């Protein structure tokens, strides 16, 4: 069974970061080793929260503890998401290096959460620069949304063709796979949720209907998306099939959340359709 060291945020109430991704990844049949960068009462879109950012040394201490019992060699991938400080980022990259020394075949999947003030997502100063300058070249896979794609590349993206070109420019700087998690205004259709999966040689586009939650969208969709893609790839799924499963599984979670009249992602209620989605979507090679 594959093992993923998942270094992300944690909320006690609701679903974001590890709280959104950990259970679905386990439900898909992998072991998850959750290591929390922050522990908050709830996610920041509520406008009020309590909790703390973990000291950067805490991350190193935990990883070293796993090394001390000689189990880092069993880690197949490191997944990182929301980080509380650029110092944490440096310690995460040190952990990635330590894992890869123990298991040279291990992957580093970076979800570069850079903040979106309009959505209530706030990151510390220096975090965006860390992702651009340090995490990007160290990653095997990276999963920006459109805003983060523009920040990583320093380029404005207006359409799908430009998004593919810019994603390929990121591949030239380190990662082998780039998932553009939400094309937003650069997509083909305003009423669809569209994603791209890009390598140096191939690109796939996929779309699904938007799920209407009114003014406030659920948090943690990107965390769920990244986690499920990593699981699919670790299990050996081809890139296009992995993209298709992720799109359908996340859509099922969104539908269940809407059906239940909730705002927090209903990953437990939707667990069966995470594994075996009812809806199907087709990835199109560009």
Curated annotation (Swiss-Prot):
Q: Which domain of life is it from?
A: Bacteria
UniProt keyword Mitochondrion present: no
GO BP, sorted A to Z: pyridoxal 5'-phosphate salvage
> Which InterPro entries has this protein been placed in?
PM/HMP-P_kinase-1, PyrdxlKinase, Pyridoxal_kinase_PdxY, Ribokinase-like
EC number assigned by the record: 2.7.1.35
The Gene Ontology CC terms held by the record are: cytosol
Binding-site residues for ATP, renumbered to this chain: 111, 143, 148, 181, 208-211
* Cysteine disulfide links: none
Q: Which residues bind substrate?
A: 9, 44-45, 223
Top EC category: transferase
Q: Which cofactor does it need?
A: Mg(2+)
Which Gene Ontology terms cover its molecular function?
Answer: ATP binding; magnesium ion binding; pyridoxal kinase activity
Pfam families in the cross-refs = Phos_pyr_kin (PF08543)
Q: Where does this protein act, in terms of pathway?
A: Cofactor metabolism; pyridoxal 5'-phosphate salvage; pyridoxal 5'-phosphate from pyridoxal: step 1/1
The record's keywords, sorted A to Z, are:
ATP-binding, Kinase, Magnesium, Nucleotide-binding, Transferase
Write down the chemical reaction(s) this protein catalyses. pyridoxal + ATP = pyridoxal 5'-phosphate + ADP + H(+)
TM segment ranges: none
Keyword Ribosomal protein on entry? no
The subunit structure is: Homodimer.
**Annotated function:** Pyridoxal kinase involved in the salvage pathway of pyridoxal 5'-phosphate (PLP). Catalyzes the phosphorylation of pyridoxal to PLP.
What this protein is called in its record is Pyridoxal kinase PdxY
> Species name for this entry?
Yersinia pseudotuberculosis serotype I (strain IP32953)
- This protein's gene is called pdxY
């Amino acid at each position: 069974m594959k093992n993923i060291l998942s270094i992300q945020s944690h909320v006690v109430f609701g679903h974001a970061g590890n709280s959104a991704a950990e259970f679905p990844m386990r439900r898909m049949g992998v072991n998850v080793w959750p290591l929390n960068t922050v522990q908050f009462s709830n996610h920041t879109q509520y406008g009020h929260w309590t909790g703390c950012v973990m000291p950067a040394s805490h991350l190193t201490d935990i990883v070293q503890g796993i090394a001390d019992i000689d189990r880092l060699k069993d880690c197949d991938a490191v997944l990182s998401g929301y980080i509380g400080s650029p110092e944490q980022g440096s310690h995460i990259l040190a952990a990635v290096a330590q894992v890869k020394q123990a298991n040279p075949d291990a992957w580093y999947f970076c979800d570069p959460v850079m903040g979106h003030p309009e959505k209530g997502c706030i990151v510390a100063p220096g975090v965006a620069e860390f992702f651009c300058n340090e995490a990007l070249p160290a990653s095997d896979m990276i999963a920006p949304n459109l805003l983060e794609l523009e920040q990583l590349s320093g380029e404005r993206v207006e359409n799908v063709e430009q998004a593919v070109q810019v994603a390929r420019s990121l591949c030239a700087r380190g990662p082998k796979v780039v998932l553009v998690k939400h094309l937003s205004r650069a997509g083909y259709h305003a009423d669809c949720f569209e994603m791209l999966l890009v390598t140096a040689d191939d690109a796939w586009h996929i779309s699904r209907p938007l799920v209407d939650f009114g003014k406030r969208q659920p948090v943690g969709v990107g965390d769920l998306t990244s986690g499920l893609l990593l699981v699919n790839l670790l299990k050996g799924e081809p890139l296009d099939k992995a993209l298709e499963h992720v799109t359908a599984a996340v859509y099922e979670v969104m539908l269940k959340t809407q059906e239940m009249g909730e705002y927090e992602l209903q990953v437990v209620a939707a667990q069966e359709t995470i594994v075996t989605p009812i809806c199907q979507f087709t990835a199109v090679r560009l």
